[in-house]
From Swiss-Prot:
Name of this chain's protein: Phospho-N-acetylmuramoyl-pentapeptide-transferase
An annotated GO BP: cell wall organization
GO CC terms, sorted: plasma membrane
Keyword Membrane: yes
Record's keyword terms, sorted: Cell cycle, Cell division, Cell inner membrane, Cell membrane, Cell shape, Cell wall biogenesis/degradation, Magnesium, Membrane, Metal-binding, Peptidoglycan synthesis, Transferase, Transmembrane, Transmembrane helix
This protein's encoding gene: mraY
GO-annotated molecular function: metal ion binding; phospho-N-acetylmuramoyl-pentapeptide-transferase activity; UDP-N-acetylmuramoyl-L-alanyl-D-glutamyl-meso-2,6-diaminopimelyl-D-alanyl-D-alanine:undecaprenyl-phosphate transferase activity
InterPro entries (UniProt xref): Glycosyl_transferase_4, PNAcMuramoyl-5peptid_Trfase, PNAcMuramoyl-5peptid_Trfase_CS
Function: Catalyzes the initial step of the lipid cycle reactions in the biosynthesis of the cell wall peptidoglycan: transfers peptidoglycan precursor phospho-MurNAc-pentapeptide from UDP-MurNAc-pentapeptide onto the lipid carrier undecaprenyl phosphate, yielding undecaprenyl-pyrophosphoryl-MurNAc-pentapeptide, known as lipid I.
EC number: 2.7.8.13
Organism the protein comes from: Colwellia psychrerythraea (strain 34H / ATCC BAA-681) (Vibrio psychroerythus)
Transmembrane segments: 18-38, 73-93, 94-114, 134-154, 168-188, 199-219, 239-259, 263-283, 288-308, 338-358
Length: 360
């Protein structure tokens, strides 16, 4: 929005040309989302406390979690509002990719909101019935995948970029839709599973979003993409603004979500953020790199799959509790230790993911 205003005002005063610089808007997008989160965070927390919108803690989990009961939740509303406002202010709103990501964020946020609303406000322990949750995730994810497939303007936009391999660029065809669906829905649920400790999900999300800002920049830049031998997709440049908005909103939320948390993001935040990372990975053609950089999310999801599968087939559990972060808590690790070590793992994996830009 402000990009258009800046372009108009440039004819009267050349200093407004700064609004056309992507790097400038990326920095301001981060700061805008950060400011919104920090400013409205305390107000939202007080409102949630007043309305008694607090977290319900499982009685079969770690005993240390009992003290978290009643902590305000649905703080993801703050994250989503910060992202959307910042993107609307600083992104080029004529870019269809920007609107695709906003659609996914808001849509998955609505699904998460309904789930949180039923659990926290209507006191329905099950929240949104699982089959309905996955139904709406499927509708949104599949419709997004189909839309992207049909608006693709060239082979670069539907090819699979394989990390560490220079010449391998297989065309996916209609399989692009299937893969995109699983990336969006899978990442959404993976982040949701990871969101079980204070700050555990938001920091890896910030790291991955920050890395994707770089991927979006080089993919959208004709010279950098040629130098790094990655497919050039011009529209991805504006995703830098979306990624930096996620970083800013995430940092602002972390201020209140760090141990001991004053607020939890709830499903409204985790489902939306995960879906956002998924669709951004698809747009910049880095689905496999997301699998690397989001390794903590993958690890949490695999631990649940293994736990459930083992119990159903053998009647035995592999872990003391799943997702795996609870396993380490029950082994006696203090919560901050689990959180920080998972952050360290995430940082290492993000650096490996960034290395794929050059190591081919």
């Amino acid at each position: 929005m402000l990009l258009w205003l800046g372009e108009y005002l440039t004819q009267f005063y050349s200093a407004f040309n700064v609004f056309s610089y992507l790097t400038f808007r990326a920095i301001i997008s981060t700061l805008t989302a950060l400011f919104i989160s920090l400013y409205f965070g305390p107000k939202l927390i007080r409102y949630l406390q007043k309305m008694q919108i607090g977290q319900t803690v499982r009685d079969d989990g770690p005993e240390s979690h009992l003290s978290k009961s009643g902590t305000p939740t649905m703080g993801g509303l703050l994250i989503l509002a910060s992202i959307v406002i910042s993107v609307l202010l600083w992104a080029d709103l004529s870019n269809i990719y920007v609107w695709v990501v906003l659609f996914v964020i808001v849509s998955f946020g609505i699904v998460g909101f309904v789930d949180d609303y039923r659990k926290v406000i209507r006191k329905d322990a099950n929240g949104l019935i699982a089959r309905w949750k996955y139904f709406w995730q499927t509708v949104i994810g599949l419709s997004t995948a189909l839309f992207l497939y049909f608006i693709a303007q060239g082979p670069n936009e539907t090819a699979l970029l394989v990390p560490f391999v220079k010449e391998l660029l297989p065309q996916l065809g209609i399989f692009y839709v299937v893969m995109s669906y699983f990336v969006i829905v899978g990442t959404s649920n993976a982040v949701n599973l990871t969101d079980g400790l204070d700050g555990l999900a938001i920091v890896p999300t910030i790291m991955v979003a920050g890395a994707f800002a770089l991927f979006a920049y080089v993919t959208g830049h004709v010279n950098f993409s040629a130098y790094l031998n990655i497919p050039h997709i011009a529209l991805t440049s504006e995703l830098v603004i979306v990624c930096t908005a996620i970083v800013g909103a995430g940092l602002g939320f972390l201020w209140f979500n760090t141990y001991p948390a004053q607020v939890f993001m709830g499903d409204v935040g985790s489902l939306a953020l995960g879906a956002a990372l998924g669709v951004i990975a698809i747009l910049v053609r880095q689905e496999l790199v997301l699998f690397i950089m989001g390794g903590v999310f993958v690890m949490e999801t695999v631990s649940v799959i293994l736990q459930v599968g083992s119990y159903k087939m053998r009647g035995q559990r592999i872990f003391r509790m799943a997702p795996i972060h609870h396993h380490y808590e029950l082994k006696g690790w203090p919560e901050p230790r689990v959180i920080v070590r998972f952050w360290i793992i995430s940082l290492i994996l993000v650096l490996i993911g960034l290395a794929t830009l050059k190591l081919r």
